[in-house]
């Protein structure tokens, strides 16, 4: 037998191990390595948005008032996109445009690129946070995969689309009414509602809402009587080992309603994940197509017949005319720097005019 004499030397922790221990410590709010990206970026994005909507005008970029200081409210205030003349400049505060002048930087629209970039990295940090936590507690990473869908939409709308156009000017500004303006722009200039990728996105979001409502109602309807409490929540025991609701009863119910029903909880919940995530991914792909000015469905035969026959009109041809009206009215209002002037006879006229 061999006896080893001497004291065991404990390995010294390096800086990485020390940081890893602190960042991944079990605490009320988990930080993690992803938190190094998430928390600063989220702080700066929200701080920039609150600063912009409170104090900063859009007069120099859009000819608009956009702050509480100018009289806007929560629905009409916005952090607006930079001027079209600045194209795709990242508009750093220290860059050649603002040259370190914070007031000038705000006037040029620098807060928009600041909020957009920090917002995007904040969202990515939140997705990485879900990956990190899932790995720590040995869960599958489907939460993070699902969250990639809204990230894809954000990146495609706020970055890919304006990169395909002439500048950040054509991205959405960060505000409620500003987003509505952007939606109208998408419809008028891209016929977005007739785009098959938009249709898939709508089917995904509304389908997910329907699935959530059906699933929640079905679970509530088939709860086991596991207590004598006054309501569902008082009767529920968080440490129970048995099922909360009867999948068999739910399956029999929907089999009678539709003729088919989910017989497996895994497939049911995967479908509830698949529908909205795929819809949002498809919508993001469609916006990438719009960045390249790819067109939606064109039913040219109907347009030709409507042009030749005054008595022939479809909902499609009516929508095409409405899009032309949006473009004619909106271009001059939306792009004042172009000094667009349309002859009176080409502008659409409604009953109010």
UniProtKB/Swiss-Prot annotation:
Q: What does this protein do?
A: Photosystem II (PSII) is a light-driven water:plastoquinone oxidoreductase that uses light energy to abstract electrons from H(2)O, generating O(2) and a proton gradient subsequently used for ATP formation. It consists of a core antenna complex that captures photons, and an electron transfer chain that converts photonic excitation into a charge separation. The D1/D2 (PsbA/PsbD) reaction center heterodimer binds P680, the primary electron donor of PSII as well as several subsequent electron acceptors. D2 is needed for assembly of a stable PSII complex.
Give me the residues that bind chlorophyll a PD2, please.
Answer: 198
Keywords from UniProt, A to Z, are:
Acetylation, Chlorophyll, Chromophore, Electron transport, Iron, Magnesium, Membrane, Metal-binding, Oxidoreductase, Phosphoprotein, Photosynthesis, Photosystem II, Plastid, Transmembrane, Transmembrane helix, Transport
Catalytic reactions on record:
2 a plastoquinone + 4 hnu + 2 H2O = 2 a plastoquinol + O2
The note on cofactor binding and number reads: The D1/D2 heterodimer binds P680, chlorophylls that are the primary electron donor of PSII, and subsequent electron acceptors. It shares a non-heme iron and each subunit binds pheophytin, quinone, additional chlorophylls, carotenoids and lipids. There is also a Cl(-1) ion associated with D1 and D2, which is required for oxygen evolution. The PSII complex binds additional chlorophylls, carotenoids and specific lipids.
Which residues bind chlorophyll a ChlzD2 per the record? 118
**What EC number is given for this enzyme?**
1.10.3.9
Q: Which residues bind pheophytin a?
A: 130, 143
Q: Which residues carry this modification: Phosphothreonine?
A: 2
| UniProt similarity note | Belongs to the reaction center PufL/M/PsbA/D family.
InterPro entries in the record: D1/D2 (IPR055266), Photo_II_D1/D2_sf (IPR036854), Photo_RC_L/M (IPR000484), Photo_RC_L/M_CS (IPR055265), PSII_PsbD/D2 (IPR005868)
GO-annotated cellular components? chloroplast thylakoid membrane; photosystem II
Which residues get modified to N-acetylthreonine? 2
Binding sites annotated in the UniProt record for Fe cation? 215, 269
Span-the-membrane segments of this chain are 41-61, 125-141, 153-166, 208-228, 279-295
Gene name per UniProt: psbD
Report the domain of life of the source organism: Eukaryota
Quote the subunit structure annotation: PSII is composed of 1 copy each of membrane proteins PsbA, PsbB, PsbC, PsbD, PsbE, PsbF, PsbH, PsbI, PsbJ, PsbK, PsbL, PsbM, PsbT, PsbX, PsbY, PsbZ, Psb30/Ycf12, at least 3 peripheral proteins of the oxygen-evolving complex and a large number of cofactors. It forms dimeric complexes.
User: Any extra detail in the entry?
Assistant: 2 of the reaction center chlorophylls (ChlD1 and ChlD2) are entirely coordinated by water.
**What's this protein's name?**
Photosystem II D2 protein
Mention one GO molecular function: oxygen evolving activity
**How is this protein positioned relative to the membrane?**
Multi-pass membrane protein
């Amino acid at each position: 037998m061999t006896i080893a004499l001497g004291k065991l030397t404990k390995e010294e922790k390096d800086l990485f191990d020390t940081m890893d221990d602190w960042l991944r410590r079990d605490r009320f709010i988990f930080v993690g390595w992803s938190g190094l990206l998430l928390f600063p970026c989220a702080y700066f994005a929200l701080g920039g948005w609150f600063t912009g909507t409170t104090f900063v005008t859009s007069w120099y970029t859009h000819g608009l008032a956009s702050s509480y200081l100018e009289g806007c409210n929560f629905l009409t205030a916005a952090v607006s996109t930079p001027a079209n003349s600045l194209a795709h400049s990242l508009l750093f505060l220290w860059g050649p445009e603002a040259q370190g002048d914070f007031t000038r930087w705000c006037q040029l629209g620098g807060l928009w690129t600041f909020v957009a970039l920090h917002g995007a990295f904040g969202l990515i940090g939140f997705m990485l946070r879900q990956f990190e936590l899932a790995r720590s507690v040995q869960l599958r990473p489907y939460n993070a995969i699902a969250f990639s869908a809204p990230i894809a939409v954000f990146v495609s709308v706020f970055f890919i689309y304006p990169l395909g156009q002439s500048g950040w000017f054509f991205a959405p500004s960060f505000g409620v009414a500003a987003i509505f303006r952007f939606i109208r722009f998408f419809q008028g200039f891209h016929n977005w509602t007739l785009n098959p990728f938009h249709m898939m996105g709508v089917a995904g979001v509304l389908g997910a809402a329907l699935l959530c409502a059906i699933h929640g109602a079905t679970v509530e309807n088939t709860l086991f009587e596991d207590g004598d409490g006054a309501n569902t929540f008082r009767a529920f025991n968080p440490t129970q080992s048995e099922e909360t609701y009867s999948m068999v009863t739910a399956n029999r119910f929907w089999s009678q309603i539709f003729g088919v029903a989910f017989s497996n909880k895994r497939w049911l919940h995967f479908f509830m994940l698949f529908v909205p995530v795929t819809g949002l991914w498809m919508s993001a792909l469609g916006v990438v197509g719009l960045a390249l000015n790819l067109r939606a469905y064109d039913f040219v035969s109907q347009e030709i017949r409507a042009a030749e026959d005054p008595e022939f009109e479809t909902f499609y041809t009516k929508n095409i005319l409405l899009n032309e009206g949006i473009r004619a009215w909106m271009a001059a209002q939306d792009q004042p720097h172009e000094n667009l002037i349309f002859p009176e006879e080409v502008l659409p006229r409604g009953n109010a005019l």
